[in-house]
């Protein structure tokens, strides 16, 4: 986290006093990026005024502007960028009025945002994390060795402040750029679906899979290095415990831990949000396909009717005999019950009536165990009962038995914590696990 030595009112007064302002229309921004691209090809990082005019000429051609006033407009743009502190101008008496221009840190930062930083590279992120791990390893070892104030400032505080913190800021910037890239991909997908969703399905799938893969790769890289980085930060923090003169180091370590937690949590949150968006797009495509089937059929039918005289067609349908209603109308008016005889296996019995009868019978039979204080072995009793009923009723009878048995009492063995043995209760593989009820 950055530490400002000035207060907000002081910064406001400073910006007003120095007349800070940045105005970059599309043309000027393109000119600045052209300068950065050409400047990257030079070893000295310097450009002459003539080279800047040539770069502006390319920009003017790209914007289809007139070529008659290129030199004047180029000089105005150069002077404006110098005033806004995007370019530094160096003049010399020996150069006879020819100036040399270099990009300022502000100009480099703006062009990096639009050119270099937008190119996400997992290899670059891996190298940054590797450098951070090495710096933290050395700082942790130096912290555990201990030393005077100069030792802590040179070997612990300085690497954390000027190397680790800056790389964390760079990773944070990469993640913020990934956020913008996701928004850009969403806009591209929306534009494709609005044009022709059938032709856009493949392109949408490619954009979704590429972004998902990039986010997953980023998160895997961060998680692989995150634990090791946190461990080294904890080593440094433990070494500062009990030393009041190391509050600055302890605060810096805490800030780095918070920043690392935020970086790692961002990765997982971004993946979760993207998965939700991915599902939303696929759901939209599936809905569009389902709706399109009916729409296409209706459209084809309408066109066929409209162009019948140009392209006659025939309609084929099944010609089956009519189904006559042979029911007796008087039979429907009769309200008396239809009587008849059915085999015993087909007779219908209401389940509630059967359950009430079984419950009463089982309750009366089990009551003997409570009155005479006889231990109730639920497995044996259940096996005897189930033998009296068909297999289809075993589950219902067993459930009623268990409900009535637990109302009578409890088993002292339940308090021992030992599991009961499994006992077979029928010949079809059913088993029950219950202690003997001996306390009513």
Curated annotation (Swiss-Prot):
One of its GO terms (cellular component) is nucleoid. The keyword Signal does not apply. Gene3D superfamilies: Chromosome partition protein MukF, middle domain, MukF, C-terminal domain, Winged helix-like DNA-binding domain superfamily/Winged helix DNA-binding domain. It is found in: Cytoplasm, Nucleoid. SUPFAM superfamilies: MukF C-terminal domain-like, Winged helix' DNA-binding domain. Its main location: cytoplasm. Keywords: Calcium, Cell cycle, Cell division, Chromosome partition, Cytoplasm, DNA condensation. One of its GO terms (biological process) is DNA replication. CDD domains: MukF_C, MukF_N. GO terms for molecular function: calcium ion binding. Residues 208-236 are annotated as: Leucine-zipper. InterPro entries: Chromosome_partition_MukF, MukF_C, MukF_C_sf, MukF_M, MukF_M_sp, MukF_WHTH, TonB_box_CS, WH-like_DNA-bd_sf. NCBIfam families: PRK05260.1. Interacts, and probably forms a ternary complex, with MukE and MukB via its C-terminal region. The complex formation is stimulated by calcium or magnesium. It is required for an interaction between MukE and MukB. Involved in chromosome condensation, segregation and cell cycle progression. May participate in facilitating chromosome segregation by condensation DNA from both sides of a centrally located replisome during cell division. Not required for mini-F plasmid partitioning. Probably acts via its interaction with MukB and MukE. Overexpression results in anucleate cells. It has a calcium binding activity. Belongs to the MukF family. This is Chromosome partition protein MukF. The gene is mukF.
